[in-house]
Regions:
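Hydrophobic/aromatic-lined pockets within catalytic cores
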Residues: 165, 210, 214-217, 221, ...
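Short, hydrophobic/aliphatic alpha-helical segments
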Residues: 157-169, 274-278, 304, 330-332
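A well-structured
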Residues: 1-243, 255
Length: 332
């Protein structure tokens, strides 16, 4: 059985690497029609792959030798499978394809946004740099331009959201859940806490963190010399604006390498591998999807970091965050 599991795992790695590469190529350039077609094709394949995967997971979870297998591969793997199995049934295959299509539509729409501001053309990522500038009017103006886009595209965005909510609620009910929240906890493999735990956590945040947050906002307003902190002020903590990293990409990478060299523990060699192998796409550009993520190419044992640098401290924060994911995945 263990040998069969290893063969299955290798097949999953190969399929997973293909799906990861397809998603990466799509998010790198949402205007690339070939990349979009590949993404659509992989979305259509995914439910069938999940169905085959689930059959094997069910067989292993119910296997007579489960206790012996857990000693070999650990019990956590079986806990994750028990969470994943109830989240799929062939009855929702078409719904999953539609869900992926809606996600692609949203990604393409937001990636297409262009903002003319401060004599430059910006996307959703680069317009965000103004939130950390010292000039309050500039901060406010950038936010107005950005949110005007959401207002102009509100009908399409609302339609996508409405369709997605109803689609997911329908999937949950087809699978026997009351709503998508119950399904969502299983899909995210939350095997060590539940809705009740999160509800208690929210209460604690409201009781202890929110009052502290209000105090910090008051102190921030005093630091900035304003009467009240508005939403276009929230990212700034100094009258002079926030400290900015080097604006040259190569200089940023050099400083990152220096930092990891000082830390050691394998981070230095790992980052050099990431740089030399081209396993990073960090600069924002037209047509590129927003946000940041880390994914893994399991067949070659290397992760990939996707981000959108915009010239603020957030570049450093997002990058080091994703590097943590990447290094953990690489070492494990």
């Amino acid at each position: 059985v263990l040998n069969s599991m290893k063969q299955w795992d290798q097949q999953r790695r190969e399929v997973g690497t293909y799906l990861a590469l397809v998603y990466l190529r799509f998010t790198q350039n949402t205007t690339d029609e070939q990349a979009k077609a590949e993404k659509d094709q992989s979305d259509k394949m995914r439910p069938k792959l999940t169905e085959l995967d689930n059959r094997i997971k069910k067989a292993l979870v119910q296997h007579a030798c489960r206790s012996e297998l857990e000693q070999q591969v650990g019990s956590q793997m079986f806990s994750l499978w028990e969470s994943e199995i109830p989240t799929f049934d062939p009855a929702i295959a078409d719904d999953l394809i539609e869900e992926s299509g809606l996600e692609s539509q949203y990604t393409t729409l937001t990636a297409s946004a262009e903002f003319e501001f401060d004599n430059e053309t910006h996307n959703h990522s680069t317009i965000g740099k103004y939130r950390e500038y010292a000039d309050r009017d500039l901060r406010h103006g950038a936010e107005q331009v950005k949110w005007q886009w959401f207002n102009e595209n509100g009908e399409e965005l609302d339609d996508l959201y409405h369709t997605m909510v109803n689609l997911r609620h329908g999937m949950a009910q087809k699978l026997g859940f009351n709503n998508y929240v119950e399904l969502g906890y299983l899909k995210m493999c939350r095997v060590d806490y539940n809705q009740a735990d999160v509800a208690r956590y929210r209460q604690m945040v409201q009781q202890h963190v929110t009052p502290l947050g209000n105090i910090i906002r008051q102190q921030q307003a005093e630091q900035l010399g304003i009467d009240k902190t508005m939403y276009w002020d929230e990212a700034v903590y100094h009258k002079e604006g926030n400290p900015l990293p080097p604006q040259e990409y190569d200089a940023m990478i050099k400083l990152a390498q220096d930092m990891f060299d000082q830390q050691g523990y394998g981070l230095d060699e790992f980052f050099q591998l990431m740089t030399d192998g081209g396993y990073m796409d960090l600069q924002s550009r037209k047509g590129k999807a927003g946000g940041g993520y880390c994914m893994s190419f399991d067949t070659i044992g290397m992760p990939f970091i996707f981000a959108n640098f915009k010239g603020t401290r957030a570049d450093v924060e997002v990058f080091t965050h994703e590097m943590g994911h990447a290094f953990q995945g690489y070492m494990s």
